[in-house]
């Protein structure tokens, strides 16, 4: 009896040890999986911050090699990084918020093998980003560039904004596609694409800026955003045969942008003519530019909500 009792106790102890070992093994496995996906994201953020620090040093230094004085080189960098880019990145607050919501949705669909749901999410997110990007591009060219130059009292803000406006669709779509790839456990791939884009920007700083000035850096920004967005798209196309919808994602946003801008211009001219006897208004004033932007966005949203993109 004593021996049986001792054996039972030993068996219980062995079971506890095995359970503890299996729990520790599972914990180790979970930690490895989390690290596998978290490290590329952390590396991506780290490299981005390191590049921004290096960029603050490289741009003025390369502009001095180009022939600008020290003061003009620093001033040019300040105009690009402190005035132009914040204007371009302002609408990305919408896409960044959307990408935060996309990641868990795509991750859930991927875990239960709902490919059709992932494809639907892809279509909807790209459609929204293309509408936002093309409309933003039109507004930057027509109004926001002039508004920024007026507010900052710096005419070159307008020129730089016009040059960089074309990256808006690629920049916003890239954010959503990167979030979707992260949700599909492709964090290492998105990190590699980001490093590729950063390498192009660094190469443009080193190779182009000493020869053609700040335009070389702008060209590097444009090329890197287009290339990284294209790489994200190609990867998703290989996985889900995600085909571009040219009509809904390019032609329709462009048409709606033209309609919205034209309608707001006509409406503002009518309002200006009616109120001219009370308060003189000019189409180049800050009030007029802000009114055009707000009215164009309002008209665009109204039309967008009435159009069926399925």
Question: Which functions belong to the PLM regions below?
Answer:
Residues 88-113:
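Helix-loop junctions and terminal segments of transmembrane helices
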Residues 37, 41, 76-84, 117-133:
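Junctions where cytoplasmic loops transition into the N-terminal start of transmembrane alpha-helices
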Residues 119-170, 203:
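Alpha-helical transmembrane segments of multi-pass membrane transport and lipid-handling proteins
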Residues 1, 159-185, 189-209, 214-236, ...:
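Short runs within selected transmembrane alpha-helices of multi-pass transporters and secretion channels
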Residues 45, 248-310:
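Transmembrane alpha-helical segments of multi-pass transport proteins
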Residues 46-87, 108, 148-152, 270-278:
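Helix-terminus/linker motif at the lipid-water interface of multi-pass membrane proteins
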Residues 33-49, 82-85, 89, 129, ...:
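Residue-level signature of transmembrane alpha-helical cores of multipass secondary-active transporters
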Residues 1-7, 14-26, 121-141, 147, ...:
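Short alpha-helical transmembrane segments in multi-pass integral membrane proteins
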């Amino acid at each position: 009896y004593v021996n049986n009792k001792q054996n039972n106790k030993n068996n219980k102890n062995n079971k506890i040890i095995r359970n503890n070992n299996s729990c520790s093994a599972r914990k180790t496995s979970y930690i490895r999986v989390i690290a596998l996906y978290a490290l590329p994201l952390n590396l991506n953020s780290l490299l981005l911050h390191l590049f921004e620090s290096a960029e603050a040093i490289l741009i003025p230094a390369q502009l001095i090699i180009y022939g600008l004085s020290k003061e003009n080189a620093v001033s040019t960098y300040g105009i690009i990084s402190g005035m132009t880019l914040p204007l371009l990145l302002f609408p990305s607050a919408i896409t960044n918020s959307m990408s935060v919501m996309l990641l868990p949705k795509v991750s859930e669909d991927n875990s239960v093998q709902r490919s059709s749901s992932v494809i639907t999410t892809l279509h909807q997110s790209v459609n929204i980003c293309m509408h936002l990007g093309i409309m933003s591009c039109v507004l930057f060219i027509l109004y926001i560039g002039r508004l920024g130059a007026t507010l900052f009292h710096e005419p070159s803000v307008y020129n730089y904004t016009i040059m960089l406006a074309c990256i808006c669709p690629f920049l916003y779509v890239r954010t959503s596609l990167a979030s979707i790839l992260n949700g599909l456990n492709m964090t290492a791939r998105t990190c590699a694409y980001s490093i590729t884009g950063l390498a192009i920007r660094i190469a443009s700083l080193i190779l182009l800026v000493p020869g053609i000035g700040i335009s070389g850096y702008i060209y590097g920004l444009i090329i890197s955003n287009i290339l990284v967005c294209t790489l994200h798209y190609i990867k998703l196309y290989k996985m889900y045969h995600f085909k571009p919808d040219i009509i809904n994602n390019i032609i329709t946003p462009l048409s709606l942008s033209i309609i919205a801008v034209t309608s707001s211009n006509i409406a503002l001219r009518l309002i200006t003519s009616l109120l001219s006897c009370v308060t003189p208004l000019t189409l180049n004033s800050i009030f007029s530019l802000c009114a055009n932007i707000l009215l164009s966005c309002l008209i665009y949203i109204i039309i967008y909500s009435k159009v069926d993109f399925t």
